[in-house]
Amino acid sequence: MTRNNFSGAAAHSARSIWRNGRLATLREDLQGLGIVENGAVVCEGGRILFAGPEGELPAELIENTEITDLEGRWVTPGLVDCHTHIVYGGNRAREFEMRLQGATYEEIARAGGGIVSSVKATNALSVEGLVEAALPRLDTLISEGVTTVEIKSGYGLNIEAELKMLCAARALEQIRPVRVVTSYLGAHATPVEYKGRNGDYISEVVLPGLERAHAEGLVDAVDGFCEGIAFSVDEIRRVFDKARSLGIPVKLHAEQLSNLGGAKLAASYGALSADHLEYLDEDGARAMAAAGTVAVLLPGAFYAINEKQKPPVEALRQAGVHIAIATDSNPGTSPLTSLLLTMNMSATLFRLTVEECIAGATREGARALGLLAETGTIEAGKSADLAIWNIESPAELVYRIGFNPLHAHIFKGRRID
């Protein structure tokens, strides 16, 4: 995937060495977390030149180099939040109260709440207003070591507003030390004026909006919501056909509230990921594995809507599907801006292992964005995106609740305190 250069905090050009660290590299050619004791990382020009045991550090890399002693701290890849909706206006606190009174997510949506209720507040804001509203959410993610974040549109539901959201996402990348990947989510919900006319909405808004987003360089992937309260398999297929014709990768919200066959549809298009998946079946898992489609699990949404059906984690494991996790940060069903808490939720609610949680928030998150060649592991040739932690073992990142042990993080070779 082609990425724009980050200009808000340019890559650090000078060579630097981070030594005396305990590296959880997440390299796939190593077992478990890919741990390297007494490790060192050499960065130059925003890239990793060397990552491995300090004793194997080539002498020529040490000359004329800035050296930082990590004092035995743990180092992981920078975290990757691969599914968010952090650009929006307003909030949905009233719906939170409704859920406490017994209303379900589907009942709220059918009554005109849910996604559609965020549209008015979002449409009322300018690009600058959306950036201002999103910054506290993004800053909270960055404060926990996130160096890559995916941001979706989907609260505009008209062409200009969807493009405005994507412009805001691109703007965030220019003013914060983070890599932003954008997803066009025009097929998120049907606006009131198109109620009962999903096909017309796709023809008149979603598809031409996608063409414009692509022409203006605003979209890295195309997403959709395949669900009874949103869009059918056939309707999403129209969107994915357009994405394919434009050469844009796809992903899908699938099997969250029911099984419509969205995961199989996503797999048939070689989707980067299928997300949520509470109602995924074994056939869907096998299709995803065959296509290399990543399962993105979203425990924040599961928790917030008090869902009872859990994603079939064991079926995903048995099929060999890569598993990522993400905050799904959004105003209604996952008002969550902590990837660390997401790790704990993934373990506690979905019974993922510590290794799966950490991999899910680093390597597999990068895989779900088509960025594994760029980030997500600590190895030579990749972007120098690192998180440095004040912990005794990596398990603490998953085990602790309401705890941020980040010492510092590095984005494209530049230290961010």
Swiss-Prot record:
Question: Which residues pair up as cystines?
Answer: none
Q: Does the keyword GTP-binding apply?
A: no
- Which UniProt keywords are given for this protein, alphabetically ordered? Cytoplasm, Histidine metabolism, Hydrolase, Iron, Metal-binding, Zinc
Which InterPro entries does the annotation name?
Amidohydro-rel, HutI, Metal-dep_hydrolase_composite, Metal_Hydrolase
What is its pathway?
Amino-acid degradation; L-histidine degradation into L-glutamate; N-formimidoyl-L-glutamate from L-histidine: step 3/3
Coiled-coil ranges per UniProt: none
Co-factor requirement: Zn(2+); Fe(3+)
Q: Name one Pfam family in it.
A: Amidohydro_1
Q: Please list the residues that bind Zn(2+).
A: 83, 85, 253, 328
| Positions that bind N-formimidoyl-L-glutamate | 155, 330, 332
Per the entry, the cofactor note is: Binds 1 zinc or iron ion per subunit.
Q: Does the record carry Iron as a key word?
A: yes
Catalytic activity reads:
4-imidazolone-5-propanoate + H2O = N-formimidoyl-L-glutamate
Q: What is its EC number?
A: 3.5.2.7
User: Which cellular component terms (GO) are annotated to the entry?
Assistant: cytoplasm
Compartment list: Cytoplasm
Which residues make up the binding site for Fe(3+)?
Answer: 83, 85, 253, 328
Q: What is its main location?
A: cytoplasm
Q: Which GO terms describe its molecular function?
A: imidazolonepropionase activity; iron ion binding; zinc ion binding
Source organism's superkingdom? Bacteria
Q: List the PANTHER family.
A: IMIDAZOLONEPROPIONASE (PTHR42752), IMIDAZOLONEPROPIONASE-RELATED (PTHR42752:SF1)
Physiological role: Catalyzes the hydrolytic cleavage of the carbon-nitrogen bond in imidazolone-5-propanoate to yield N-formimidoyl-L-glutamate. It is the third step in the universal histidine degradation pathway.
Note the HAMAP family from the entry: HutI
User: Which family does the entry's similarity section mention?
Assistant: Belongs to the metallo-dependent hydrolases superfamily. HutI family.
Task: Write the protein's name.
Answer: Imidazolonepropionase
Organism, scientific name: Chelativorans sp. (strain BNC1)
What are the top taxonomic ranks of the organism? Bacteria, Pseudomonadati, Pseudomonadota, Alphaproteobacteria, Hyphomicrobiales
Gene that codes for this?
Answer: hutI
